[in-house]
Amino acid sequence: MKFSRILDILGFLSILGANILSTSCQKKSDFINTLHNSVLYNAHPENSPLSNSQKSTLNITAMDTFMTIQSYGDKKNAEIANQKAKEELLRIEKLLSVTDIESEIFRINHHQNEWQNVNQTTWEVLLEAKQMAQLTHGSFNPCLYPILSAWGFTTGSFSIPENDTIQYLLQFTDFEKIEFKDSYKIFIPQNMMIDLGGIAKGFTGDKIIQILKENGIESALLDLGGNIQTLGTKPDGTKWNIGIKNPLTGEVAASIKVENMAVITSGGYERFFTASDGKKYIHIIDSKTGFPVDNEIASVTILSSSGTYADALSTALFVMGTEKAFSFWKEHRDFEMLIFTKDKRSFATEGLKNKVDFLDDSFEVYWKNYF
């Protein structure tokens, strides 16, 4: 085993973290193109059944991505609500950033083998992350930071680690070893490092929706770096129309009508590198092997009332592959799912039958039911 390479990785991690959340956003006149999904706008606030409904839009860069919050209602009230949502977003980012030396996650990661007092929010999202890891048997895993770093996904200096390095680092990815105490205390063992990039945006979206509700907003749309979350319906009383991208071409392949819903996609097309042998390695890691996932799935979209749940599940079910993903869906029955595969098949759960329109006929559609 080449310990010099391992020590280089662990030494680097001891002084520096990197947030792996990354996205791009391109605006068009009739819809917003995000990394994963599109919001197809047909809302006409002037015809809204909501009294004095006007749109207040907040654009912000946070968690290393571009985000938009659109709230509808009384103009002044919507602006106040958006400002409070912004404050909450920045507060959560400050707590959960893996790079900010003043964040609580950074402190936890750099004080291993010590109990750390944390904010209630940090404690809550870490508990949610561990529970999602348990629920998915490690397909979602918040402890993969050292392995992501070994592959270069935290720095952009990509390389294929030696197998001995991967096997060594896998020792430090056992999420069951994250410990919790009352009064908001957290413990992680030596050499473990937490990265909440696979759940933080969904968790944040849930908190923002809660704040908007508390401030009298009944209609809102969040686009948090490709994570879409909606509050209520559009101002005209109709459902939001969310476009799901064809992961092979970037065009809109399907549209889904939703209200009070998170629509979150994971795909292997947004962060990857191509090695010298021509093989593509994506940023989604299988925690059982330490290697980037290489299966038939091109993207997984989850619909759930919980952004936290949808965010973690979209990654977990991508890792599982199509067959195990649908077995999980049949067992839990508390979300809907749309999968696009590399060989141009699309699999959709039966709960989407009256909600989704397929716009790309190059995909063969398969409907899944509980039986």
Give a label for each model feature.
Residues 2-11, 15, 19-371:
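Mature catalytic core of soluble alpha/beta enzymes
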